[in-house]
Amino acid sequence: MTLFESINAGGTQILGVAWPTVWALVRILVVAVVILLCVAYLILWERKLIGWMHVRLGPNRVGPAGLLQPIADVLKLLLKEVIQPTQASRWVYLVAPVMVVVPAFAVWAVIPFQAGAVLGDINAGLLYAISISSVGVYGVILAGWASNSKYAFLGAMRAAAQMVSYEVSMGFALVVVMMTAGTMNLSDIVGSQMRGIFASHGVTFLSWNWLPLLPAFVVYFVSGIAETNRHPFDVVEGESEIVAGHMIDYSGMAFALFFLAEYINMIVISALASILFLGGWSAPFEFLSFIPGIVWLVLKVFLLLSVFIWVRATFPRYRYDQIMRLGWKVFLPVTVIWVVVVGFWIMSPLNIWN
């Protein structure tokens, strides 16, 4: 009996019919706290890594090696006043940051951390993740409109157009994964990558989807960078053009919620990419399978997050027209063609996903 099964059995004996509700709330709270800690230290890792790339030390003053810097940043934001513009629509202005951050948390309901460790193991998990992650754009649009600022509204319109453009390509990339796995359950998609000729010979990483579905993987990950408005696709909040975009009139914790949502979405994109294309919690080689699956998933997510940061430190920002051209004239045709190619591949005698 696993640790979770033991806790579940003991809780049922103590609380009876109330235990399932209590256990669900405990799991949600634990996941939320872990996500918040991950975001805090992801920001520190980003500042450290970019500092090293710039031949600097990065934050190193607060605590040993700067490890308490995230706590200092949170305290600073908590103590700042949320100043509301006089011409702003009060309630919409305050609700918009919440509408951005809630979907970012809600996606984690279906993301499995290892076999059996998921808040909600639903069959349409992939569809749920795509749908709920698309809702955040409404909060961005409302933030730009409610601020009653032309710069904020321009940033919000850019965000809406950019997110819609890249969601189409991202959706087709995920359709390819669904076709090969034959399911939308995220746990089953990971299981489908642990079978095949290479996996039977102990070389599991060659059975992962990244190899046969490489174009879809590249399109998904780059579209994920654009979806999160990260550099080099950060024209939504282009500092040299419209300052902070839709967040220009926000301060204090209201401003922090937008950044919280951005970094949570970075982790979501990396986690989904790891699950859909990099085998999730499976070890790259059979002889390493003694290491807990959650360790492998965390390592893969950390690697992809580091790529996010590396791209920010090395690439110049695209112009808005270049971003739209990349989404509609490059990524969309590539993913549509790849859907057709994989469809014929599955129907042919060379099908490797049987």
Swiss-Prot record:
Keywords: Cell inner membrane, Cell membrane, Membrane, NAD, Quinone, Translocase, Transmembrane, Transmembrane helix, Ubiquinone
Pfam families: NADHdh
Broad class of enzyme this protein falls into: translocase
Subunit and partners: NDH-1 is composed of 14 different subunits. Subunits NuoA, H, J, K, L, M, N constitute the membrane sector of the complex.
Function of the protein: NDH-1 shuttles electrons from NADH, via FMN and iron-sulfur (Fe-S) centers, to quinones in the respiratory chain. The immediate electron acceptor for the enzyme in this species is believed to be ubiquinone. Couples the redox reaction to proton translocation (for every two electrons transferred, four hydrogen ions are translocated across the cytoplasmic membrane), and thus conserves the redox energy in a proton gradient. This subunit may bind ubiquinone.
NCBIfam families, sorted: PRK06076.1-2, PRK06076.1-3
Name by which UniProt lists this protein: NADH-quinone oxidoreductase subunit H
